Swiss-Prot record:
Family matches, as SUPFAM superfamilies: NAD(P)-binding Rossmann-fold domains
Active site per the UniProt annotation: 181 (proton acceptor)
Residues that, per the record, bind substrate: 168
EC number(s) on file: 1.-.-.-
Superkingdom classification of source: Bacteria
InterPro entries on file: NAD(P)-bd_dom_sf (IPR036291), Sc_DH/Rdtase_CS (IPR020904), SDR_fam (IPR002347)
Similarity field: Belongs to the short-chain dehydrogenases/reductases (SDR) family.
Protein name as catalogued: Uncharacterized oxidoreductase HI_0048
GO molecular function terms noted in the UniProt entry: oxidoreductase activity, acting on the CH-OH group of donors, NAD or NADP as acceptor
Keywords attached to this entry: NAD, Oxidoreductase
Length: 285
């Protein structure tokens, strides 16, 4: 989009290296393509190499500089190998965006409230699968911690070095049905604050973005029926969002650019910034 491109082009990150995990996903692929307009080099890390490589090709065809790397963010040795490959191609990390994350159906309940007369086939809290819960916590929390261990070492003392984690409005108040995801994102917010303090003497800032409900291909069926009308859950969301609408990926870009550009946020550290239309601020009354 021309509008978002112009926003990104206002930030000059030339000769900086931005490393993005989960870069093949819907959200991070969009952000990566926009960040390329800052003139930064972009390293795209994802377990799905084909998805990340597609993004890299789009960036390069548009005049940017990017390369994809097949990466398992839960395998420390693999991350270290990728780090060495990136150093050969671009140098060392200046800005790390920990975008890998997600939920799992095995860690999700069917019901919002437990009741005495539930159907036997209903997946309740008591039916949540241990492996599904572990998957969600590992992917979201360890999937941010391990890349930070590897790449932050190269960022020590660098001018403008910073880390961005992707939290969620779930971190403030958990949503129904997704206890593991809500808990994992709360851990990300806590980890963000911990990192901000830990690295405060060596020049690395750490902040997080907490997206609200954004419309994407991944959640389209959850939010709208086949006729394009909001589902019951979507109506609940809209009722509890003071701005009365869903967000779009483009609306995260301004928050991200603000946090990563030290010309705008050099004294901003340890912040979890909601981009949710007021959802996390509203009590419902």
């Amino acid at each position: 989009m021309e509008f978002t491109m112009n926003i990104a082009a206002n930030h000059n990150l030339e000769n900086k290296l931005i490393i993005i995990t989960g870069a093949g996903g819907v959200l991070c692929s969009f952000l990566a393509k926009q960040l390329a307009y800052t003139k930064a080099n972009i390293a795209l890390l994802d377990l799905n190499f084909e998805a990340a490589d597609k993004v890299a090709k789009e960036i390069n065809q548009s005049g940017g500089k990017a390369k994809a790397y097949k990466t398992n963010v839960l395998e420390l040795e693999n991350i270290k190998e990728v780090r060495n490959q990136i150093e050969t191609d671009f140098g060392t990390c200046d800005i790390l965006i920990n975008g890998a994350g997600g939920n799992n159906p095995k860690a999700t309940t069917d019901n919002e409230f437990h009741q005495f007369d539930l159907n036997e086939t209903t997946r309740t809290f008591f039916d949540l699968d241990k492996s599904g819960i572990e998957f969600v916590f590992n992917l979201n929390y360890l999937g941010s911690l391990l890349p930070t261990q590897v790449f932050a070492k190269d960022m020590l003392g660098k001018q403008g070095a910073n880390i961005i984690n992707i939290s969620s409005m779930n971190a403030f108040t958990p949503l129904t049905k997704i206890p593991a995801y809500s808990g994992a994102k709360a851990a990300i917010s806590n980890f963000t604050q911990w990192l901000a303090v830990y690295f405060s003497k060596v020049g690395i800032r750490c902040n997080a973005i907490a997206p609200g409900f954004l419309v994407s291909n991944q959640n389209l069926a959850l939010l709208f029926d086949t006729e394009g009308k909001p589902t019951d859950r979507a109506n609940k969301i809209l009722t509890n969002t003071p701005m009365g609408r869903f967000g779009e990926s483009e609306e995260l870009l301004g928050a991200l650019l603000f946090l990563i550009d030290e010309n705008y946020s050099a004294f901003v550290n340890g912040v979890v910034l909601p981009v949710d239309g007021g959802f996390s601020a509203y009590s419902g009354v």
